[in-house]
């Protein structure tokens, strides 16, 4: 059996008279239906009355949900010309080097299919699709306020523009806009341009300069340039072997524009071969793409063989360790080596080699770091392919330093040993450092359903226990120095509203002090408030409150001192550093420096 005690795990599946799946049980050890202490140990679904076999209701396990009617309900509707079921009609078309967005008002009633999904806590989402099945609009309701995300297509059915909620709120007129000139689209929209073969050649993300893409005749990405690359006058380039595997990625200084590159590669198939010595500028590969000598390879990858080892003494050769398997000479289809350069100093490179056994498993990885340190990793597997021992060896290149510091040692070995139960679950982890005694890092315990219920750390000095509800949601963490309980909808403290969709209603934390934190959410499942209480239900501080814009960015945080900290982390070009003063439980006040990096156009 698959359970820790060797019992069989039974799964039950239910079907209706039309042979449609309608239910599935949780795993039951030896078929014991009372294992979970809940009569509703299964999930299920209910179909609509139409012949389309559409599911109108799904429910998960748990009496707390089923007895309270807490399921996910789906209604299948058609659009209307007003209200929550209305949908704006957008389309996109090319306009030279620009994409034009055109709004033609609203779709006429009955033109679109609408699915209205209501989760267990009454949160509503509408999805609008056309007769071709293309998703046009996702409308999430925060109470009565819609948050609309539109996907706009061209006449060929290609996705051209995505309008998130703030953009959708601004573009309400029956009009057209150029994506390169509209401030709203530049700030919030996602825009895509294609070539005649339906390949994306330009992508614009909110607030960013466009990313350009160039392909060869085989539709492989050859060049890419984002806004920062353009400012630096470089392109990212890619080279591939005959099987389409990326062999080189690097940067290429060039002022050539995308259109000129497209002409160069339009009829070219860029396929590189490894030919070894004589191609030092390309690390043993040919250069059919004819990139100039000013290019800087950043990652070079080798496959199928180890002929590349002759290119550099920095590649560490195979170390024969019979306990860790035997290598094969030609691991076909496998990544065998890499040269990885530092981005800020490409002259410094790490050389990595991977060795495989006859079952295609990595048994040895050797790396010479940018500083010249030698690192070896050896892996031993059991019959079914699980690692049972991992040995890591580190060798320094500074023996002279040991003369100055005789007590120091710069060569180390760490061995990790793993034990598993009969079902492949890890049960023990051991570590041996250098020649020290082997210690047990962790021991894991599972319940009969296979869930982790306990973890003992460092030879039994630290014991952690975990508990779950019937849906597998974590409900308690019990450790020697703290206890945390997570409440959803069962055994709630007085005054806490139950939540059924997976949001946490209350957290109890006990360490030096004990406290409850009652959590509130908006209609989009965003945390809006956290109120702290003592275990006796007495408020200890004002609630922390959070507000958001329609993009999901935090716009303000109200902290226990009742001071508002304005949050600018996602606003372009406004502010980099925010010092937010606040008091913690009204005991003392401190300033928290919060760093936000501006997005670069």
Predicted features by range, described:
Residues 1-601:
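Beta-strand elements of repeat-based all-beta scaffolds
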């Amino acid at each position: 059996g698959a359970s820790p005690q060797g019992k069989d795990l039974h799964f039950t599946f239910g079907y209706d008279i039309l042979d449609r799946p309608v239910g599935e049980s949780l795993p039951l050890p030896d078929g014991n239906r009372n294992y979970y202490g809940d009569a509703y140990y299964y999930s299920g679904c209910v179909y609509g009355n139409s012949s389309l076999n559409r599911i109108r209701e799904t429910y998960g396990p748990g009496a707390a949900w089923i007895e309270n009617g807490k399921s996910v309900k789906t209604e299948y509707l058609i659009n209307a010309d007003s209200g929550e079921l209305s949908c704006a009609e957008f389309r996109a078309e090319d306009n030279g080097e620009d994409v034009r967005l055109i709004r033609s008002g609203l779709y006429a009633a009955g033109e679109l299919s609408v699915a209205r999904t209501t989760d267990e806590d009454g949160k509503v989402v509408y999805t609008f699709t056309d007769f071709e099945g293309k998703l046009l609009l996702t409308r999430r309701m925060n109470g009565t306020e819609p948050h609309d995300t539109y996907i706009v297509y061209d006449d060929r059915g290609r996705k051209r523009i995505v309008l998130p909620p703030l953009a959708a709120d601004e573009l309400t007129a029956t009009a057209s806009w150029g994506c390169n000139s509209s401030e709203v689209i530049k700030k919030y929209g996602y825009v895509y341009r294609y070539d005649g073969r339906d390949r994306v050649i330009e992508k614009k993300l909110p607030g960013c300069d466009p990313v350009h893409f160039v392909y060869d005749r085989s539709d492989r990405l050859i060049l890419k340039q984002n806004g920062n690359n353009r400012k630096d006058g470089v392109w990212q380039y890619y080279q591939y072997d005959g099987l389409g595997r990326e062999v080189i990625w690097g940067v290429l200084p060039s002022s050539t524009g995308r259109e000129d590159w497209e002409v160069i590669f339009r009829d070219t198939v860029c396929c590189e071969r490894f030919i070894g010595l004589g191609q030092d500028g390309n690390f043993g590969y040919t250069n059919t793409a004819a990139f100039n000598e000013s290019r800087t390879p950043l990652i070079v990858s080798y496959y199928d063989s180890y002929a590349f080892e002759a290119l550099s003494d920095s590649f560490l050769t195979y170390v024969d360790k019979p306990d860790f398997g035997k290598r094969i000479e030609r691991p076909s289809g496998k990544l065998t080596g890499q040269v990885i350069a530092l981005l800020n100093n490409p002259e410094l490179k790490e050389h990595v080699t991977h060795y495989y056994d006859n079952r295609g498993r990595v048994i040895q990885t050797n790396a010479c770091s940018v500083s010249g340190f030698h690192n070896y990793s050896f892996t031993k597997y059991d019959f079914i392919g699980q690692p049972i021992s991992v040995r890591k060896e580190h060798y320094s290149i500074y023996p002279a330093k040991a003369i100055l510091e005789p007590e120091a040692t710069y060569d180390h070995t760490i061995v990790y040993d793993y034990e598993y139960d009969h079902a492949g679950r890890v049960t023990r982890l051991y570590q041996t450092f250098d020649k020290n005694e082997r210690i047990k890092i962790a021991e894991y315990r599972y319940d009969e359903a296979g869930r982790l219920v306990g973890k003992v750390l460092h030879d039994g000095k630290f014991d952690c226990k975990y508990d779950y509800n019937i849906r597998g949601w974590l409900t308690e963490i019990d450790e020697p120095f703290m206890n945390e309980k997570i409440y959803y909808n069962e055994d709630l403290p007085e005054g806490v509203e139950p939540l059924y969709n997976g949001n946490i209603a209350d957290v109890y934390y006990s360490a030096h002090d004990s406290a409850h934190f009652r959590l509130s959410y908006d209609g989009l499942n965003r945390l809006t408030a956290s109120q702290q209480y003592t275990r006796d239900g007495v408020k200890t501080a004002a609630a922390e409150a959070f507000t958001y814009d329609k993009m999901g960015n935090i716009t303000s945080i109200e902290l226990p001192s009742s001071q508002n900290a304005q949050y600018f982390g996602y606003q372009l070009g406004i502010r980099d550093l925010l010092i937010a003063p606040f008091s913690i439980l009204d005991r003392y006040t401190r300033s928290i420096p919060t760093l936000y990096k501006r997005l670069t156009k």
